[in-house]
Amino acid sequence: MKESLRLRLDQMVDRYEEVTALLSDPSVISDNNKFRELSVEHSDLMDITTLWQNYVGAEKDQADAEAMLKEASDPDMKEMMQEEIDSARDTIVEMEEALNLMMLPKDPNDKVPAFLEIRAGTGGDEAAIFSGDLFRMYQKFAQNQGWTLEILSANEGEHGGYKEIITRVSGNSVYGRLKFESGVHRVQRVPDTESQGRVHTSACTVAVMPEVEIDDTVDLNPADIRFDTFRSSGAGGQHVNTTDSAVRLTHIPTGTVVECQQERSQHKNRAQAMKMLISKIQQVKVQAQVDAADTIRRDLVGSGDRSERIRTYNFPQGRMTDHRINLTLYKLDSIMEGDLDEILDALLREHQADLMASIGGA
């Protein structure tokens, strides 16, 4: 292991011990914001500190066993010491790999809620129906994770599904788990309306954006935002509110448009829409930085161009293929029921491998 990494890990242990002591300080306990901030830091440091201490312990065990092996004359004792050395080496290799992963740069947005947008693309009615299928897939995945999913805006298709649906997903590490879902999702299947049994190809776009706090990171001039209201409508086009409580915000310089009709209160809808607008504009800034840096998310989210297909759902074959990592799974039924862990885990591993390669080449 590199000496610079050892030094950094030792510093993290020192900081962990410092934070542990601070959490017992009455002045910190009485300050809710400070206590919450330190508690999060303590939780973030705990696992890597424990693993590093175990790693150092395994190195000591190996060194002790090697010293005893040199002094041993009994064949049985030598064999036992060699087994201990081999075991310690294997443990050290495994823990070093884990430590390298844990030391990779973290996306500061990984733990925040996310806005999930699904839009029907090419394919007409079938694309809208598939948008509905994707929404239910993510909804079931969110339920399995213990997350909360709120529908902020929905434009239903004429024959089912959605032309567009925008949701907010909150819970533990939502954005970090879903961020690789952005892109074009293609479906191949026989529509219910197809009398000849021909397979049709349709597509939907998925966009996942972190919910960012409204602060100075995005400087918005109120004069650049057009504010419109309209009546929110529910399923089947029935009005669920007789007042103009739904809100549409348009950022004129960028042409960015967001809508929110979740709440009966216009004020609440406007506040939520402003968060969505901030997140969209922030995402454009982040994507520009990623494109300039070029490589880190090269195969995972691509350039952000919506013409880029990331995944195909082939219903006749029961197959899902993620084209970014050449992953094919023949369990489409369970995937559409929200079984996404195997896909998301594989995408995360590839992302981590890319990060390690970029750091190693730096």
UniProtKB/Swiss-Prot annotation:
Location within or outside the cell: Cytoplasm
Gene3D superfamilies: 3.30.160.20, 3.30.70.1660, 6.10.140.1950
GO cellular component labels: cytoplasm
Principal location: cytoplasm
Gene Ontology molecular-function annotations: translation release factor activity, codon specific
Coiled coil: none
Keyword line: Cytoplasm, Methylation, Protein biosynthesis
Pfam families: PCRF (PF03462), RF-1 (PF00472)
PTM entry text: Methylated by PrmC. Methylation increases the termination efficiency of RF1.
Residue positions, PTM N5-methylglutamine: 238
Protein name as it appears in the record: Peptide chain release factor 1
Gene name of this polypeptide: prfA
